[in-house]
Regions:
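Positively charged n-region of N-terminal signal peptides that target proteins for export
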Residues: 1-4
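Residue-level signal for mature regions of secreted extracellular proteins and peptides
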Residues: 8-9
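Bacterial signal peptide processing site
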Residues: 15-19
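Compact, glycine-rich, soluble single-domain proteins
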Residues: 22-156
Length: 156
């Protein structure tokens, strides 16, 4: 008899709406590329654009193509180039593109394990505070020419 009394409760539980798991935060990665580097180079550089679906942070990057990868920034205080590691990674604001580009934030491949040849691919795994990791192949290509470069201008 007690089993029959539980039957309506079980039936109601089976009909109740199930709670859906919240959608996982995501980060879109576009325009990923790396500069060429000769075999034996001490470092290489990669660039990309990140757009997060919610506030997040790029925390670390890994690549089998290098001993390790660091997130760096570069600036020119007083006309002297200074590069430093961003130990806290890169803050990502929901819906805003965060560019890692020449002359600014970038990924530094420390101890590339071989030549980064034009047309080659560099596998990268990006890890975030909230979003799942993103693995991609960045193409090795020549950097774009500066917008101000011209045939008659001197480059110092």
């Amino acid at each position: 008899m007690r089993k029959l009394a539980l039957l309506p409760i079980l039936a109601l539980a089976a009909c109740s709406p199930k709670a859906e798991a919240p959608a996982q935060a995501t980060v879109a990665v576009t325009d990923a590329w790396c500069r060429p580097a000769v075999a034996g180079a001490l470092s290489g550089a990669c660039y990309l654009t990140l757009t997060a679906a919610s506030d997040d942070r790029l925390t670390t990057v890994e690549s089998p193509a290098a001993g390790h990868v660091e997130i760096h920034t570069m600036d020119m205080p007083g006309g002297v180039m200074r590069m430093r590691q961003l130990a806290d990674g890169v803050e990502l604001t929901k819906g805003e593109a965060a560019e890692l580009k020449p002359g600014g934030r970038h990924l530094m491949l420390i101890g590339p394990k071989g030549e980064l040849a034009l047309g080659g691919k560099v596998p990268l795994t990006l890890r975030f505070e909230k979003a799942p990791a993103v693995t991609l192949d960045a193409e090795v290509k020549a950097p774009p020419a500066p917008a101000h470069a011209g045939a008659s201008e001197h480059q110092h």
